Swiss-Prot record:
It comes from Aspergillus niger (strain ATCC MYA-4892 / CBS 513.88 / FGSC A1513). The gene is jip5. This is WD repeat-containing protein jip5. Residues 395-404 have a biased composition (Basic residues). GO terms for cellular component: nucleolus. InterPro entries: WD40/YVTN_repeat-like_dom_sf (IPR015943), WD40_repeat_dom_sf (IPR036322), WDR55_POC1 (IPR050505). Residues 40-63, 358-425 are annotated as: Disordered. Belongs to the WD repeat WDR55 family. Residues 367-385 have a biased composition (Acidic residues). PANTHER family: WD REPEAT-CONTAINING PROTEIN 55.
Length: 425
């Protein structure tokens, strides 16, 4: 399914990664406060006479271009998210600010001050998510979950959240929106699942926190939604997958939030398994069934087939740094990030790839951080290093060195391709 890997070096540790919802674009937030946006090559199948072909195609076939780069925050850039339409990139940093910038140019259009803690200190962000064109969600270290109404014409740094909740006793470690109901008129999600500490919670846009699970006696770190599973009995074929600190993936039936109903051991190890830091469901277009990619604290990415409930394949992102970011772009390529590296995993081709590399060869791109051109995209002097404070990469668990030498550098999905098609998902 995937074959070669492209490596994008970064100038500092990765804290956050966001994929554009409509274009082959990835943005990264770094420990240095920088935000950088790359444009990936488009599919070769695109028409040669397409006048809207992106800059990558015009500048040279297969080039990965830096669209813009700037020091967006005085301190670390903790989290990033694109708006629903992809026009706006939201970032939040340890300087206590949310910034909304044009995704294409990086020019800041608005700023919002994050509410401080009771003692007046900065409440650093942990997650930012655009729930709809009207609603922006922000979670912080203090366990607060703020809701901003984007329809209100904010003045700079004066905006206050419309609502604030505390769904957990600890900071919110993951946030997963639930699909809109069949009766929804907007088509946008109005409920979401969060994890924090050892609990899972469901919050509603209008009614606040609806339910909180029992104590799972394990730190819950990551989550994602998967639908289209086989419905039977009380199961409607919709589940939320939750990754824990001990290497266990738990399955939660949508609507039955008191406790988990299934467990999958993704990574076993002496003294406890490896933490499951991030995950993403493989796009249906890839034709691999119901499979979720799981990024681990030891730098591996494992592919778990839901239904069979087993690990089907794995690859190595990095031998020493954990996986912080994981997702699939609009062309079905997997993008992983962690440490000072982002990797783009391409779908397998026969013979040489579109960059002239043969399957299994690792392609390096060294121009991503050679220059700070475009650092003036933020017109508020954000590229000043004075007073900047860096904190540690936001791995939910302590990063550990992967065992073994020489990580696999190609997408070896033989197991995924060869598993019997009779498996019921």
């Amino acid at each position: 399914m995937f074959d070669t890997v492209c490596t994008l070096p970064l100038s500092a540790d990765l804290f956050s990664q966001a994929l554009h919802p409509k274009e082959p674009v990835v943005s990264v937030g770094l420990s240095s406060g920088h935000v950088q946006t790359f444009r990936l090559p488009t599919d070769e199948a695109a028409s040669d006479d397409d006048e809207t072909s992106n800059a990558s195609s015009r500048n040279g076939r297969g080039h990965i271009d830096t669209m813009w780069r700037t020091r967006r925050h005085k301190g670390s850039c903790r989290c990033l998210t694109f708006g629903i339409d992809g026009e706006t990139l939201y970032s939040a940093g340890t300087d206590g600010l949310i910034k909304a910038a044009k995704a294409e140019t990086g020019v800041v259009e608005n700023k919002i001050a994050i509410p401080t803690e009771k003692n007046g200190s900065i409440d650093a962000p942990t997650i930012i998510h655009a729930l709809s064109p009207q609603t922006l969600l922000l979670a912080t270290d203090s366990s607060a979950l703020h809701l901003y109404d984007l329809r209100i014409p904010y003045s700079k740094v004066s905006a206050k959240p419309e609502q604030s909740h505390h769904p957990h006793d600890d900071y919110v470690s993951s946030l997963t929106p639930l699909p809109a109901s069949d009766t929804s008129t907007s088509g946008f999600s109005k409920q979401w699942v969060t994890t924090g500490g050892t609990t899972l919670a469901v919050t509603d846009l209008r009614r606040g926190v609806l339910v909180r699970s029992e104590d799972q006696e394990e730190e819950l770190i990551s989550s994602t939604y998967i639908g289209g599973l086989a419905a039977s009995g009380t199961s409607r074929g919709e589940k939320v997958l939750v990754g824990g600190s001990g290497g266990v993936l738990t399955l939660w039936e949508k609507g039955a939030w008191d406790d988990q109903d299934e467990r999958i051991y993704v990574e076993r190890g002496g003294g406890g398994g490896e933490s499951l830091e991030t995950m993403a469901v493989l796009p249906d277009e890839l034709g691999k069934g119901k499979v979720v990619a799981v990024g681990l604290g030891n730098g591996r990415v494992k592919f778990v087939r839901i239904g069979a409930n087993k690990v089907a394949a794995e690859v190595m992102h990095d031998e020493t740094e954990g996986v912080i970011g994981l997702g699939f772009d609009v062309e079905g390529r997997m993008v992983t990030g962690g440490g000072q590296v982002v990797k783009v995993w391409h779908e397998a081709v026969v013979g040489a790839d579109r960059y002239g590399a043969m399957p299994g060869e690792k392609r390096m791109y060294g121009d991503s951080d050679d220059s700070d051109e475009g650092d003036d995209s933020d017109d508020d002097s954000d590229d000043s290093d004075a007073g900047g404070r860096q904190d540690k990469p936001q791995n939910k668990r302590k990063k550990t060195k992967a065992k073994g030498k020489g990580g696999q550098q190609i997408m070896a999905f033989h197991d995924l391709d060869s598993m019997e098609s009779s498996v019921v998902y």
